[in-house]
Regions:
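Folded alpha-helical bundle/alpha-solenoid domain cores of large eukaryotic adaptor/scaffold proteins
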Residues: 1-293, 300
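Long, low-complexity intrinsically disordered regulatory regions
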Residues: 309-325
Length: 325
């Protein structure tokens, strides 16, 4: 690992203490943390009074590490600093996708009209039964529309829904354009986003703690403290903004689940968007199949009409020919 480090050993910790991000990447810093000397190793090296150049490269490196108070803690802070911007950016992007998807779904008038049509169809099919006057339906019922078939077994309720909408509300057929963030949101796991938010908060706490302790280290940590204070000034503001977005996402997710009449404690966000994404795909597929079936029927009708016209032209000719004879 040491052979991959571009910075000379005697400058390595100076780069770390100066928080020079270009000196090392995250993997290299993590490997350095593994190299941190144990108490036993430190005691052995402290007792060495010979020439440092006669030691192996690893031993020389351990002696460099020993010069820095709480070197492991500082390396972890350095690692956090290197990853901070990308971590915050990635989490912000993921949260924004969840937020946008939640708002798009709730604000889609087209999707709402489709849901109303599904309810009307369900009540019509169940007319005369206890289910014939329902005021709503469970979200997972959307996925059962492909299971209910007509007597000829060719058309499903999903096909019929698309046909009704095509006849009565054709403008809603492209509702999927209203929910552009549905598919990327379906790839998100809120549990992992929560863990990432927690990791960033804990990492920042460690930075604050190390800064407070390092201020008593003396000259060796002066640059480290100066750079860390500057980093904290912007990092704390970034994390506050991120935490605010995270809270907003939590509220929007709950509102989305309640919008469909479900319980946030029992129906997680992942289930909602997964169900809606599958419904969208099945809906689009059924609509496309309807379109192809209609084209096929129109083609057959046209061919039938063509044959009829041709036969009508042939028949008089045959009669006239017979009269001549």
């Amino acid at each position: 690992m040491l052979s991959k480090v571009k910075v000379p050993l005697h400058d390595l910790m100076s780069s770390v203490l100066a928080l020079e991000e270009s000196a090392l990447d995250t993997d290299q810093v993590e490997n350095l943390i593994k190299f941190c000397p144990t108490k036993e190793e430190m005691e052995l090296l402290k007792g060495y009074n010979g020439e440092k150049e006669k030691l192996g490269r690893c031993e020389q490196f351990l002696m460099e590490l020993m010069k820095v108070p709480r070197v492991e803690s500082k390396l972890r802070v350095f690692s956090f600093r290197i990853q901070f911007n990308s971590q915050v950016s990635d989490l912000r992007n993921s949260l924004s996708v969840v937020n946008s998807a939640s708002e798009e779904i709730r604000n889609s008038v087209k999707l709402k009209r489709i849901m109303q049509t599904i309810l009307s169809l369900g009540n019509a099919l169940n007319q005369g039964t206890a289910k014939g006057s329902a005021i709503g339906f469970r979200l997972d019922s959307l996925l059962k529309l492909t299971e209910t078939r007509a007597r000829d077994k060719k058309m499903t309720l999903m096909h019929y829904l698309c046909k009704v909408l095509d006849d009565q509300l054709p403008d809603v057929l492209d509702f999927s354009k209203d929910v552009a963030n549905l598919e990327p949101a379906a790839k998100m796991q809120l549990k992992f986003l929560a863990e990432e938010m927690q990791a960033i908060n804990k990492g920042l706490e460690k930075v604050v703690q190390e800064l407070s302790t390092s201020e008593n280290d003396g000259p060796i940590s002066e640059t480290f403290c100066k750079k860390l204070k500057k980093f904290l000034g912007s990092a704390e503001a970034d994390v506050r903004s991120l935490a605010s977005l995270y809270s907003s996402v939590g509220r929007n997710v709950d509102q989305l689940i309640l919008y469909f009449g479900e319980d946030p404690a029992r129906c997680p966000f992942e289930q909602v968007v997964s169900t809606l994404l599958n419904f969208t795909r099945m809906f689009n597929k059924a609509h496309e199949e309807n379109r192809k079936q209609l084209e096929l029927e129109m083609k057959k009708t046209a061919e039938s009409e063509k044959k009829k016209c041709e036969s009508e032209r042939i028949l008089p000719t045959a009669i006239r020919t017979g009269n001549v004879k």
